[in-house]
Amino acid sequence: MAPSLRVAVTQAEPEWLDLAGTVKKTCELITEAANNGARLIAFPECWVTGYPGWIWARPVDFELNTKYIYNSLSIGSPEFEQIASTAKRHSIAVVLGFSERTSTHSLYISQAIISPQGATLLHRRKIKPTHVERAVFGDGSGADLSNVVDVDFGGDVGVVKVGALACWEHTQPLLKYHTYSQGEVIHVAAWPPIDPHPGVEHPGLWSMSAEGCQNLSQTYAVEGGGYVLHCTGVCTEKGMETMGTHKGLLFHTPGGGHSCVIGPDGRRLTQPLHGGDPAKEGIVYADLDLTNVVANRSFLDNVGHYSRPDLLWLGVDRKQKQHVIPRDEEEPSRKANVVVPKQE
């Protein structure tokens, strides 16, 4: 029998601007998914503690921004360890999207992959926040390019390569190609709540709509030849009221939920939850036949037989850039460029 892995893709609304409440809900969803046989669960972009939708209405809001910082999640914090402990207790891998808070109160759009054993296998930051997201979040660095890890599911499944990107990172050809090159089998495409496009005459970008974003995830599946867990959040009247987004470009109507599972050839494998009501919460489940990845790549492997690295290749700098480098720890290349004045 072919190895099969049950996955769970959340379509849920966070407890907006409430770290403790969202962590509690996260653990409840992890438990629910595990009780239904899932061995991996995916969460959307900035699930903890909600995507800051007000930035698309008013980029400067000191009160909300400050509250958002205080309610963002720090790596190694008790709240993070609570999520990891829940994953370990239920032997389920967790791919978590969150607003990361550093010790200096900077924020990053981050993702973590937690193993069924409770270990943090991956912590990465979005390479470049999109448009007005830059009013809140900083950039990732070289280490964040390594975004695929080996997850040991044990039993008949064993080790599977799982990776993640956030939102419009799925528009970046070089970043996608680098991710493919790491041998990814299951990819989590994390998105915020996203709404259908209003129509051809509307000035809003189709590529930011529910249809456009799913198209990007399906394209990713085709190019990468692996399964894609397309994970979106939900925003109801509660979120709109909390963030004051009724008159904003985005988050002005209840909805946003369009989670699904996409096969290695790009086809959608699951039906919309609740008859397609994007304001309803739930979990999408799918049983993945991992041999389909092998079969698909016998036709198309963009980082293998279906490529020409002798003609086209990608250069990568994976070094993490530090803000402060002591002089005695400078790289040789930096030292070589230092000009020491002659002593008279």
Swiss-Prot record:
- Name the keywords, alphabetized: Aminoacyl-tRNA synthetase, Hydrolase, Ligase
Top-level taxon in the UniProt lineage: Eukaryota
Which PROSITE patterns does the entry mention? CN_HYDROLASE, NITRIL_CHT_1, NITRIL_CHT_2
**Classification via Gene3D superfamilies:** Carbon-nitrogen hydrolase
User: Where's the CN hydrolase domain?
Assistant: 5-290
In this protein, the active site sits at E45 (proton acceptor), K126, C167 (nucleophile)
Which PANTHER family did the record assign?
Answer: ARYLACETONITRILASE, NITRILASE
Q: Which family does it belong to?
A: Belongs to the carbon-nitrogen hydrolase superfamily. Nitrilase family.
Q: What is this protein called?
A: Arylacetonitrilase
Q: Provide the species name.
A: Macrophomina phaseolina (strain MS6)
